[in-house]
Amino acid sequence: MKKGTQRLSRLFAAMAIAGFASYSMAADTIKIALAGPVTGPVAQYGDMQRAGALMAIEQINKADGVNGAQLEGVIYDDACDPKQAVAVANKVVNDGVKFVVGHVCSSSTQPATDIYEDEGVLMITPSATAPEITSRGYKLIFRTIGLDNMQGPVAGKFIAERYKDKTIAVLHDKQQYGEGIATEVKKTVEDAGIKVAVFEGLNAGDKDFNALISKLKKAGVQFVYFGGYHPEMGLLLRQAKQAGLDARFMGPEGVGNSEITAIAGDASEGMLATLPRAFEQDPKNKALIDAFKAKNQDPSGIFVLPAYSAVTVIAKGIEKAGEADPEKVAAALRANTFETPTGNLGFDEKGDLKNFDFTVYEWHKDATRTEVK
């Protein structure tokens, strides 16, 4: 994590001790809850979400706000824990906040959406990819990222085309996000007529995967797909290298964090990951990227610009609706397209993006990435 992001994370964590932190000076405001992990093992993804959302709030407010009102970001810490996410959602409702950017992890997002839908709160997640989140007929739940059933086939087809002659293992962390996307990858690979030699779950939070790695070595595994987050992937990479497992590793966007290099070191070189397109490299976003850099913030984090887009969509939806009424804003979101740093976004009836592309990248030990052609 870069120094600016580390300072930001410490600030968020200190303020979140009281349950939330608020960012606005105006009396006439529209509050937006920024719900995600301030603490916990994947707090880095919460840092990305907040950096993007707060930048959008700042820039919208400087441009005279929304319908004469200023936006106010209110931070809530769910630690990517489902039970804590429910508590956060109830607090958002009790605080009278009607719009949410978050949550971050699929496993914490889904239970929170039940409360938001029942209580008339509009939520847009910039990062939760589990299809189940938007498959229950809810009208107030949206996202500015693609789904596992979009991302999984991209990885599966890549594996089937380029590693069909290798012995393949598909692992996951037994969580909604990780197991869901691993299952999609396995299905795509097997549909191509290729056998998956090992399909197995590990426990998120465990530190020693040597027994599993020994099993992979015994099976002659040469390619490993892991559905989960960077803490476990980093340890798998490091311990596999130490054990002499000669295999290529691949994962979803949940492993695409600079912290994986801090955990795995040189073993992170060559890891493959499906990630959103590098929106920070789009020339049309140069002024925005410069604004992040002026704050010593890293705009390349995978959820930074999707979070910026989530706030942008809420603001433009309020303008289209003519008022900050969640149901009217939801109708406006489905009826229009919105220009954002992550493209012209349009939503289907479920609240999913009509179009979103995942791309395969190769990770490097200096925490940079290059697109695989």
Locations of regions flagged by a protein language model:
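Extracytosolic ligand-binding ectodomains
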Residues: K2-R7, L11-M15, A26-K373
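Sec/Tat signal peptide C-region and signal peptidase I cleavage site
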Residues: F20-A26
